[in-house]
Amino acid sequence: SASFFAWLTASPFILGDMGYSPNDIGLSYAFPTLAFLIGGYSCRSALQRIKGRTLLPWLLLAYCASMVGLYVVATQTEPTLITLLIPFCLMALVNGASYPIVVANALLPFSKNSGKAAALQNTLQLGLCFLGSLLVSAYISKPLEITVEVMLASAPVALLGYMIQRRKVVAEGLVTR
C-alpha cells in the first residue's frame, strides 16, 4: 500500500511533466485499479486450490520484480505512461492478490481480539503509507526519481515482514512438535 500512496502522491507531477492532461492522469488510475481487483478475486479463487503460505512467497517475488522493473524503466529508459503502467499494474495485481493472505495471516493469532488486531494492522499499514507519501512529498522536486526509490525501498520492507512472520510460524511449529 505504501507503494500505491507514493505513486498517488507524485503521479500528477510525474505525468504532468510528461505532458499528460489532468484527464489523462485521472484515467491512468483505471488500469491499476482493475489490476488490483483482478488480483484480489484471482487470489480468492487460487486459495481454493493452493495454500496461502505456498502462494505468498511467489506473490512477494512478483512484487519485488515489479518494483525493480519500475525502477529500471524510470531510471534507465525514457519512460512513457505505458512503460510505467506495465510494472505498476503488475504491482497492483500482486498487491490485490496478496492482501487477503497477508491480512488473514496478521489476524490469525488474535482470534479473540480480531477487532484490535485489525485496528493495529490498519494503523501500521496507513503509517507506512503516510511515510511513503511524506518521503515523496519531501523530495517532490524530482518526482519520478523519489517515487521509484520509495517504491523500490518498499520491497525489502515487505520481505522483512514476511521473514519475521515466517520465522515466528516455524518457531511455533517446532515448539508444538
What residue ranges belong to the model's regions?
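Extracytoplasmic gate region of multi-pass secondary transporters
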Residues: 1-30, 36-37
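Recurrent gating helices in multi-pass secondary carriers
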Residues: 1-9, 96, 126, 130
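Helix-to-loop junctions at the C-terminal end of transmembrane segments
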Residues: 39-53, 140
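C-terminal transmembrane helical hairpin of 12-TM major facilitator-type secondary transporters
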Residues: 54-101
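A late C-terminal transmembrane helix in Major Facilitator Superfamily
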Residues: 103-141, 150-151
